[in-house]
Amino acid sequence: MKLNFISKSWRRSLKYLLPILFLIPLFAVLLAGRSPWAIAQSPRQEIRGVWLTINDIDVLKDRAKVRDAVSQLARLNFNTIYPVVWNSGYVIYPSAVAQRMGIQPFVYHGRQGQDLLADLIIEAHRQGLLVIPWFEFGFMTPPTSELALNHPNWITQRRDGSQTWNSAAGEVVSLNPFLPEVQQFITDLVLEIVSQYDVDGIQFDDHMSLPRELGYDRYTIDLYVRETKKNPHPDSQNPEWVRWRANKITAFMERLNKAVKANKPHAIFSVAPASYDFAYKAHLQDWRAWVQKNIVDELIVQIYLSDLQSFLEKINRPEIQEAQQKIPTGVGILTGLRNKPIPMQQVQSQVLAARDRGLGVCFFFYESLWDYAPEPIAERQARFQSLFPIPARRFASHGFAIE
């Protein structure tokens, strides 16, 4: 015989009490100043972003232009801005770290004397967009920068002793990502941004890596010998030598993530690398492992291709599909360069292909959205509006959501 220990009146009370009990943790979180939905990002949060590069500095310096730019992005239903904060060995915000290191003899200010990053954050948040500063140059710096000149022992090299290499930004050298002093310097800059500004995260890109032909400096050789009991392979493509260096970069990114989260637990730790095969084999950037190890909260893979079929092959890769199951994932799409305008038809076809596969998008770069374009500004903006006819919800670390 089944015993009924709960009276009918008590069962009626439970009917009303259970929803209240369910809501108690929710209100506790809200009272603590955090949105419960901001604790972990859903993989289904759609990224609609744009990078503000050093080429956009004239926009960033002018308060009215910032307001207009953010208003336009909000009107077109974008939800995330990635402003550059680290480029060519310099930061674009007042930095005690840079001043202490003696690597920056100037400070970027707006035309009205404002802090560029703080001004952008205030305006973007007012209009419902996230701001995730972009640590563009990573370990890369020009050989003529104060950083390279003042710290020559921080620069790594090839087997023949040469150091410089040609990037899209011109001639550069690479800071040694395995050197503790370099790791501490990068960490200090990143934590300065995360702790002093109301940012929604921090982003690193394909330059948080090392060209595979580098790493033959004295410190790295000694470290490799100490750990493996053998010399680095003379062939920079040797799988074991590649794996060891890639693992070291992964370990640093894991520590950097923990440092960021210790300062701002809900900050989005974003990475925007190149396609995986190239990133790992050519630049020792094992971002697939970063995703698997839960180092990354958001992934945007740069796929700057004009041919649609080649673009489709890249976005259909299994490592992208794998990331999609865990975190918000998107594709970096080129909207043009100052000397290379991109027709809107190409942009539209790539956006539609990405979104059809559940991927978000981020455009490189802001002024090429419509200022450096083959089509008139009004037409270009109207076609962006047709791509994003309704807003996309995105949750921020401080609790507001894009409706």
Regions found by a protein language model. Name each.
Residues E227-K340:
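Glycoside hydrolase catalytic-domain groove-lining segments
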Residues Y93-P105, F139-N166, D206-H233:
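Aromatic- and acidic-residue-enriched segments that line the glycan-binding/catalytic groove
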Residues D297-F311, P318, I327-E403:
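Substrate-binding cleft of secreted/luminal carbohydrate-active enzymes
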Residues L52-L60, Q99-G113, A169-Q184, N238-K248, ...:
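The substrate-binding groove and active-site-proximal loops of carbohydrate-active enzymes
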Residues F78-V85, L116-W165, Q203-D206:
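Glycine-rich, aromatic-flanked loop segments that form ligand/cofactor-binding clefts
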Residues F78-Q112:
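Aromatic-lined carbohydrate-binding/catalytic grooves of carbohydrate-active enzymes
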Residues K65-V91, Y197, V296:
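Catalytic domains of carbohydrate-active enzymes, especially glycoside hydrolases
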